[in-house]
């Protein structure tokens, strides 16, 4: 009986395939920026700040893990992945742009190394928090909801290739921005523009998701006691 249903199962549709690719690809570009380019930007703009980089790594990993668990639980309880993808992507994009704008802290609080470090770590941590909300808790669960025996191989294969493609494209395109748009007056201009463009695209993806993306029809709210009981 299960095989008959699987054989009769229709595909996920052109729109969902498009969203799967576009949302997933834009998310991987944003992660490449956070994982690869933020530290380079920090070194270029403020010099070798190993303590700040270490703090960024620890706080980002903590925020990502907590966000995935928190919003994953919330998503199950409200029965919606769309809201997480939409609002998470918009906020993710905003804080990706904001990280580049920390460059202008040099003129205002440059001598206060502690304040600069805290601001940079906070911007990166918040960006990672909303990135995990949109991608880990929202997007990953959204496409998992559409998977069954008839399409799990296709969807899984596409999702698995996106990090590889995103890393390659993000590294190459990022290098073009960073090296090609730097000026003598502002050597960090390429970083700022790259972060702004990528953040803007992520915001647009969130807006598009609001209008185009739909949760799986089988998705229903699941509540098991209180929120923190279900969270644990």
For each predicted feature, which ranges?
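Juxtamembrane intracellular "pre-TM" segments in multi-pass secondary transporters
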Residues: 1-14, 216-232
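Helix-loop boundary and gating motifs at the non-cytosolic
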Residues: 2-64
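Central cavity-lining transmembrane alpha-helices of secondary-active solute carriers
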Residues: 53-75, 93-95
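Glycine-rich segments within core transmembrane alpha-helices of 12-TM secondary carriers
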Residues: 60-65, 153-179
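A membrane-interface helix-boundary motif in multi-pass transporters
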Residues: 81-82, 111-113, 176-200
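C-terminal ends and interior cores of transmembrane alpha-helices
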Residues: 87-114
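Cytoplasmic helix-loop-helix junction between adjacent transmembrane helices
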Residues: 124-161
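C-terminal membrane-cytosol helix-exit motif in multi-pass small-molecule transporters
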Residues: 199-219
């Amino acid at each position: 009986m299960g095989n008959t249903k699987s054989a009769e199962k229709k595909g996920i549709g052109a729109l969902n395939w498009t969203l799967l690719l576009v949302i997933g690809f834009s998310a991987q570009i944003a992660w490449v920026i956070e994982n690869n380019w933020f530290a380079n930007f920090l070194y270029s703009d403020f010099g070798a700040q190993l303590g700040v980089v270490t703090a960024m790594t620890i706080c980002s990993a903590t925020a990502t893990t907590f966000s995935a668990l928190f919003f994953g639980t919330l998503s199950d309880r409200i029965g919606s992945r769309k809201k997480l993808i939409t609002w998470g992507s918009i906020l993710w994009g905003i804080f990706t742009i904001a990280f580049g704008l920390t460059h202008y802290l040099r003129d205002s609080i440059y001598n206060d190394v502690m304040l600069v470090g805290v601001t940079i770590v906070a911007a990166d941590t918040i960006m990672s928090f909303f990135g995990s909300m949109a991608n880990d808790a929202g997007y990953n669960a959204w496409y998992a909801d559409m998977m069954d025996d008839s399409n799990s191989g296709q969807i899984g294969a596409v999702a698995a290739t996106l990090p590889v493609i995103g890393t390659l494209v993000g590294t190459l395109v990022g290098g073009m921005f960073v090296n090609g748009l730097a000026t003598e007056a502002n050597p960090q201009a390429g970083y700022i523009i790259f972060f702004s463009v990528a953040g803007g695209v992520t915001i647009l993806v969130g807006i598009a998701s609001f209008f185009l993306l739909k949760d799986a029809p089988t998705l229903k709210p699941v509540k098991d006691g209180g929120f923190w009981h279900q969270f644990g």
